[in-house]
A protein has these predicted regions:
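An N-terminal alpha-helical hairpin/helix-loop-helix interaction module that forms a charged
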Residues: 1-124, 140-231
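Cytochrome P450 catalytic-core helices
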Residues: 131-135
Length: 231
């Protein structure tokens, strides 16, 4: 086993030991996916309400201080529902290149917000963070939530390669997906991680066969470990 895997296995062992104590605060990750899967329907005549309902449990990931992608997309759906429908249809079209459709979604939202009033439109909140969230909620066995600072710390601790800081944000997002693919693969190898979920999941929580939600949770777990080590 190489050094990279040794480091990853070390932190996975620690994550396993800490999982139970973190569960109540972190289970929103699995709930966010299931809520989205149960409610998302682009044919719904009330598009803003549908988006609001579908992303209700992802609010923690999508709205916080000075960052309002959820509020922004709901607001734009009220103003231009047909355009927003088309944007999501293209974003979720797996026949198209991932990088191209992610950039197209972000740029379309940026153009659409011009002329809109309110704090949600002062800047383009439909960044790769937001785009990755939509992709993950729609295809939880393929994608992940992306945040550069989290990915950077995971890479630092596990020594799994990650994009250069100067690369375009979409490249960083895709690089993070690749990194978390490696982590989810390790999680699937051991029954003990699956057992942790099976003992806790109910109908309100996504089953997570691919262990992508758990890989995300592992990434969130790594971040405070990294920050404590720098104090």
């Amino acid at each position: 086993m190489n050094d990279v895997n040794n480091k990853l296995i070390y932190w996975l062992d620690d994550y396993y030991e800490q999982f139970s104590s973190r569960w109540d605060k972190q289970k929103y990750i699995w709930k966010a996916v299931q809520t989205f899967q149960d409610n998302w329907d682009l044919t719904d005549p009330d598009l803003p309400k549908m988006i609001e309902r579908s992303t209700a449990d992802a609010d923690y990931l999508m709205n916080h201080t000075r960052y309002y992608p959820r509020d922004m997309i709901i607001g734009l759906a009220k103003e231009k529902p047909d355009a927003i429908r088309s944007m999501f249809e293209e974003l979720f079209d797996e026949k198209q290149n991932l990088s191209s459709r992610a950039i197209a979604f972000s740029e379309a939202a940026d153009e659409m917000r011009v002329g809109c009033k309110g704090k949600y439109y002062s800047t383009n909140h439909q960044t790769m963070n937001a785009v990755s969230t939509y992709l993950w909620l729609m295809y939880p066995a393929r994608y992940y939530f992306y945040k550069h600072s989290v990915a950077e710390r995971v890479s630092s601790y596990t020594e799994i390669s990650y994009a250069n800081l100067r690369e375009p944000e979409v490249n960083k997002m895709i690089s993070e997906f690749s990194m978390l693919d490696q982590i989810s693969e390790e999680l699937r190898k051991e029954d003990r991680f699956r057992q942790l979920l099976d003992e806790r999941l109910d109908n309100s929580l996504y089953n997570d066969d691919a262990m992508h939600c758990m890989a995300m949770d592992f990434a969130f777990y790594i971040r405070p470990c990294y920050e404590k080590s720098r104090i």
